[in-house]
């Protein structure tokens, strides 16, 4: 029969549990570590396992007591349930490690429920709304252009105090001739202040030209309640009748249709000139004679001409004289009968 070898002696030392802190960290709560002689043969093996469990720069190389900082040199110096400080090659940093208490997680604040913004679609005049409204929303037509849709313009609160800035903001989106110089209501009332502006209302922007009376409220972009409000506008109906009456008058007087009158190939009739004299004639029928004599000549007497005064008249204007012939002169003169000598110049 064979003989049995001697039994190997087994270390029956119980395992030890220690709490390890990190050197110089006042917020590190500490970590429990359990080791036995079977797994940890010496002090170097313990330091290697602590390096894996406690994150220390450059690894755990020393253990200190938490109160006075005495170094631990072997496994026998460790006590069950003891507290120690793991450090690298630096010196012990004195802190109150024993009274480090784990912090309770802070309570999460309940976030307020974000409610969606509810936009109000009620269209009422601005004087009924809250004064803290930051802006005005208006719709603007272009003067004389009914078929162009109205432009929505947002006017901030700080711009409402200056009327010129309001017109300038409208002019950035609406482009009448000459820029926006005037703002009218749809029935032609001129606005000169932003206090009269109403939210979600319709206006007409114009330049230097006059307001063109067109039924803007009949546009398809205008709500039905606004169309009903302007449906019986007396001002527009009166102007429409006035324009129609002016168009009918020339058609009744002229037998030629208006298209032929406007045509360049149509020969228009000459107008008869007035036969009345523009200048009235005087008492004697002379248009150049003054009706009343001048003041200087009213008391002057007219001087009559003297009959004995001889006036030299040109030969061509002198009255013609009858010249008698020589025979008649000889018969009538007594000298010729008695044999008087007649000069040779008369022969």
From Swiss-Prot:
Matches recorded under InterPro entries: Doublecortin_dom (IPR003533), Doublecortin_dom_sf (IPR036572)
Protein name: Doublecortin domain-containing protein 2C
GO cellular component, as recorded: cytoplasm; sperm flagellum
Keywords in alphabetical order: Cell projection, Cilium, Cytoplasm, Flagellum, Repeat
Organism: Mus musculus (Mouse)
Claim: Protein biosynthesis is one of the keywords in the record: no
UniProt gene name: Dcdc2c
Region (Disordered), start-end ranges: 235-260
The keyword Cytoplasm is assigned to this record: yes
PROSITE patterns: DC
Gene3D superfamilies named in the record: Doublecortin domain
Basic and acidic residues compositional bias, start-end: 241-251
GO terms classed as biological process: intracellular signal transduction
Localization annotation: Cell projection, Cilium, Flagellum; Cytoplasm
Doublecortin domain span: 16-98, 136-217
